[in-house]
Amino acid sequence: MQPNDITFFQRFQNDILAGRKTITIRDASESHFKAGDMLRVGRFEDDGYFCTIEVTGTSTVTLDTLNEKHAQQENMSLDELKRVIAEIYPNQTQFYVIDFKCL
């Protein structure tokens, strides 16, 4: 069985599969992905594979520069997005946006 390249919390699986979540915001440890990469996607909780995505672009962002477009691409409100990012990555301010499409 092939290993997964990237994982998402299970609560995001349906939004990814339905095309409602089209970006992910990660820390420096996952800043190496680039446009054109095909990634096997698994659930964080059990590493179970659930789809393949294509990276369509990357950019950098800070907690302060997150905006409504980012929130829309994450399928949540801006306040919720900032809260989730702060919970997942406490004490960090620089992040990497990975734009993707589900294949």
UniProtKB/Swiss-Prot annotation:
Q: Write one Gene Ontology MF term.
A: hydrolase activity, acting on carbon-nitrogen (but not peptide) bonds, in linear amidines
SUPFAM superfamilies membership? PUA domain-like
Q: What EC class does the entry list?
A: hydrolase
Q: Which reaction does it catalyse?
A: N(4)-acetylcytidine + H2O = cytidine + acetate + H(+); N(4)-acetyl-2'-deoxycytidine + H2O = 2'-deoxycytidine + acetate + H(+); N(4)-acetylcytosine + H2O = cytosine + acetate + H(+)
The residues the entry assigns to the signal sequence are none
| Domain (ASCH) ranges | 6-94
- InterPro entries, per the entry: AC4CH (IPR008314), ASCH_domain (IPR007374), PUA-like_sf (IPR015947)
Annotated Gene Ontology cellular component terms: cytosol
The active-site annotation reads 21 (proton acceptor), 24 (nucleophile), 74 (proton donor)
Q: Which CDD domains match?
A: ASCH_yqfb_like
Q: Give the Enzyme Commission number.
A: 3.5.1.135
> Keyword annotations for this protein?
Hydrolase
- Gene3D superfamilies in the cross-refs: Hypothetical protein
The record's annotation in NCBIfam families points to: PRK04980.1
Q: What does this protein do?
A: Catalyzes the hydrolysis of N(4)-acetylcytidine (ac4C).
Family from the record: Belongs to the N(4)-acetylcytidine amidohydrolase family.
Q: What's the protein called, per UniProt?
A: N(4)-acetylcytidine amidohydrolase
Species this chain originates from: Salmonella schwarzengrund (strain CVM19633)
